[in-house]
UniProtKB/Swiss-Prot annotation:
Gene behind the chain: SIX3
Phenotype upon changing residue 95 to P: Loss of interaction with TLE1 and TLE5
The protein's name in its UniProt record: Homeobox protein SIX3
The keyword Magnesium is assigned to this record: no
Subunit structure: Interacts with EYA4; translocates EYA4 from the cytoplasm to the nucleus and promotes activation of their target genes. Interacts with MTA1 and HDAC2; represses its own transcription. Interacts with MTA1; facilitates the binding of SIX3 to the core DNA motif of SIX3 promoter. Interacts with EYA1; promotes EYA1 translocation to the nucleus. Interacts with TLE1 and TLE5 (via Q domain); can act in combination with either TLE1 and/or TLE5 leading to transcriptional repression or activation, respectively.
GO cellular component: chromatin; nucleus; transcription regulator complex
Biased composition (Low complexity): 293-309
Region annotation (Disordered) ranges: 232-251, 258-332
Record localization: Nucleus
Biological process annotations from GO: apoptotic process involved in development; brain development; cell proliferation in forebrain; circadian behavior; epithelial cell maturation; eye development; forebrain anterior/posterior pattern specification; forebrain dorsal/ventral pattern formation
Biased composition, class Polar residues, residue ranges: 316-332
Region (Interaction with TLE5): 72-119
DNA-binding segment(s): 206-265
Record disease entry: Holoprosencephaly 2: A structural anomaly of the brain, in which the developing forebrain fails to correctly separate into right and left hemispheres. Holoprosencephaly is genetically heterogeneous and associated with several distinct facies and phenotypic variability.
Length: 332
């Protein structure tokens, strides 16, 4: 029976990538092709001696096999044995990084599957962040979220890998929540998922993200808002360059500001209605003495006039908006 290794799926140029210099390439070629060639020669020698007896052929074959094994380089004692080639953990990590950068997830998965499962080899592999990150990437793209969570929760990653791993952590939980609810998640749903499944400290440095803009940025946004509460995309891009924000952040700030101003206008309208003629009469009914209970027509009509004028100005987009009444310290 002929045993075919999983690494037979890969071509020789893939198994000898650019990270190996000429010296290491010769070593790897000697340990693979050179060794097999030497063994084949010994076997042929044993076969030619078959006329002298079966024992001679067997001895020749054994000698050939021994000759092939003696070609292993002595400096590779720290390497672990793969089915056909000797790779150090650093070289395996380099292969994983290359495949991850190129986006060849299918080939990356096959390569990881072909790695040895011996306890000593696994321990050496798990010390390399690139290999662990590659396992997490494959688990995410194959939908094996349980393995993804296990890798991310039980291994400490450096800050350079946090962004990508955090995105996979959140997206995996989003997909599970969508599958459970049977519908796409909205912003509020995603917020609840993030609260329910916070980032593990292995991929998060504990620093809270702040959405508070600097005073200069908020001042500039307010000035533009007073000029035009509904900026077009070109103005958003221009304002984004001036403030250092993204066009999306600028659009969100204007949207939130308009919502706050509408809420403030509605609150003011209710207050004006409460102090109108009916409100004054309701205060006078219990017998409380009031001065000037007879209201002049101009005074009685003033709240209505102010509300209507405010409505007209809001419709035309030229209302004089308050800068401090509905402004907040933190804007998203």
């Amino acid at each position: 029976m002929v045993f075919r290794s999983p690494l037979d799926l890969y071509s020789s140029h893939f198994l000898l990538p650019n990270f190996a210099d000429s010296h290491h390439r010769s070593i790897l070629l000697a340990s693979s092709g050179g060794g097999n060639g030497a063994g084949g020669g010994g076997g042929a020698g044993g076969g030619s001696g078959g006329g002298n007896g079966a024992g001679g052929g067997g001895a020749g074959g054994a000698g050939g096999g021994g000759g092939g094994g003696s070609r292993a380089p002595p400096e590779e004692l720290s390497m672990f044995q793969l089915p056909t080639l000797n790779f150090s953990p650093e070289q395996v990590a380099s292969v994983c990084e290359t495949l991850e950068e190129t986006g060849d997830i299918e080939r990356l998965g096959r390569f990881l599957w072909s790695l040895p499962v011996a306890p000593g080899a696994c321990e050496a592999i798990n010390k390399h962040e690139s290999i662990l990150r590659a396992r997490a990437v494959v688990a995410f793209h194959t939908g094996n979220f349980r393995d993804l969570y296990h890798i991310l929760e039980n291994h400490k990653f450096t800050k350079e890998s946090h962004g990508k791993l955090q995105a996979m952590w959140l997206e995996a939980h989003y997909q599970e929540a969508e599958k459970l609810r049977g519908r796409p998640l909205g912003p509020v749903d995603k917020y609840r998922v993030r609260k329910k499944f916070p980032l593990p400290r292995t991929i998060w440095d504990g620093e809270q993200k702040t959405h508070c803009f600097k005073e200069r940025t908020r001042s500039l946004l307010r000035e533009w808002y007073l000029q035009d509460p509904y900026p077009n995309p070109s103005k958003k891009r221009e304002l984004a360059q001036a403030t250092g924000l993204t066009p999306t952040q600028v659009g969100n700030w204007f949207k939130n500001r308009r919502q706050r101003d509408r809420a403030a206008a509605a609150k003011n309208r209710l207050q004006h209605q409460a102090i109108g003629p009916s409100g004054m009469r309701s205060l006078a009914e219990p017998g409380c003495p009031t001065h000037g209970s007879a209201e002049s027509p101009s005074t009685a009509a003033s709240p209505t006039t102010s509300v209507s004028s405010l409505t007209e100005r809001a419709d035309t987009g030229t209302s004089i908006l308050s800068v401090t009444s509905s402004d907040s310290e933190c804007d998203v």
